[in-house]
C-alpha cells in the first residue's frame, strides 16, 4: 500500500481546488474586463419561485454613475441562443436582449426575479458605457468593488435561502448521511475493531475497506460543515469543500486498488492453474502492476476533470472529455472484472465459494457501474437536477456496495465452512502462515 500513500500525497500536492462557488460574491466591476469580453461575467444562479432576490452593494457611487454601470441578467437558454446565433449580433445588440437590467446609481440595489414557472439558471454580466467601444484607453478607469448576494425564497416565501435550485436538499442529505454514519459507528465500531485487531486472512482487506469507509464519512462530514456555513452566508467554508472532494477521491482510489488487487490476483492465479498455493490478495507483480496502472489512470482523469470543471463537484454530469473517459474506464473495469469473476464462478465446484464470488461480483459491479449508469439516467432530468441526482445516487449506491463487501468479508459462518473444505483454496488468504486454521 506504500504506492497508494504516495499517490494520495501527490494528489494533495498537485490538486487543492477552490470550494464550491459561493452565492455571496465579492470582487470588482472592471471596465477593461467588460470591454475585452463584451460584458464581464460575474456569476450564475439557479433562481426559483416568485420572490428570488439579487442584492448588490457598492461603495464608489460616483464612479459607477460616471461609467453608467449596469448589470444585465440573461436566462441561460437565451444566452446560449445568442452565443450560437448566426446573425452576428453586435455588442450593444447582445446587451439589449437581456431579460433584466439594473442601473447602479445607489449604494445598495435589490432586484426581484419573479414569476419563474420552473427553476432556471440566470447569468449575471456587468457592462458600462465603455464596454462596446473600440477605444481601450477610455476604459482604463477605476474599478468598482462590490458584494453580490443571490437568494431564493425559503419555505415561507421569504428570500433568505442561499442555495440555488440545483443545491437545494444537499444540506439535509449530508446531515442525514453523517447521522447514519454516527449511529453505525456507535453500533459496530467496537466489533469491527476487534475483528481487525485479531488479524487473520481478512485482516488487510478489512483495514483497506475501513479506511475507505472512514474517508467517505470524512467527506460527508466536511460537506455538511461546508453546507451548514453556506446556508448562513452563501460562502461556506471553501477549505472544507475542498477537503471533502479530496477525501472522496482518496476513498475512490482505496476501493479501486482493493477491488482490482483482489480480482486480478484471483484471475492470474487461475490462469496459471496453480493449486499448490492459496489465492492471495496482491500476490503477484502482474496483479500489482495492473492495479497501480489503472489507479494512476483514474487519478489523472479525476485531476483533469477537476481542473476543467470550474464548479468543482465530487461527482459530475460528464460534459467534458475527461469525464467521458472516466465513464468509459469504469464501464471497462466493470466488464473486465465481471468476465474474470464469471470464468472463476463457472469452473468453481464448491457452492459456498461460488456464492462468495457471486456476492463479491455484485459489490464490484455496483461500485463501478453506479456512476456511469446514473450519469446516463440524469439526462432525463432538468439541468439543475442532474448533479444533485448523480451526487446523491452515487453516494447511496457505493454505500450499499460497501455494506455488501463488509457482510461478505465478516461472514464467519461462510468462511468457516469454506476453510473447513480446503484451507489451500480459501479466498482472500493473505499468507501461508494462515493456512493452518481460519482466523476471525
Curated annotation (Swiss-Prot):
Any one Gene Ontology BP term: response to pheromone
Domain of life: Eukaryota
Name under which the protein is recorded: Integral membrane protein GPR180
Keywords from the named record: Glycoprotein, Membrane, Signal, Transmembrane, Transmembrane helix
PANTHER family: INTEGRAL MEMBRANE PROTEIN GPR180, INTIMAL THICKNESS RECEPTOR-RELATED
InterPro entries, alphabetized: GPR180-like_N, GPR180/TMEM145, GPR180/TMEM145_TM
Intracellular or extracellular location(s): Membrane
Membrane-spanning segments: 173-193, 202-222, 249-269, 284-304, 321-341, 360-380, 389-409
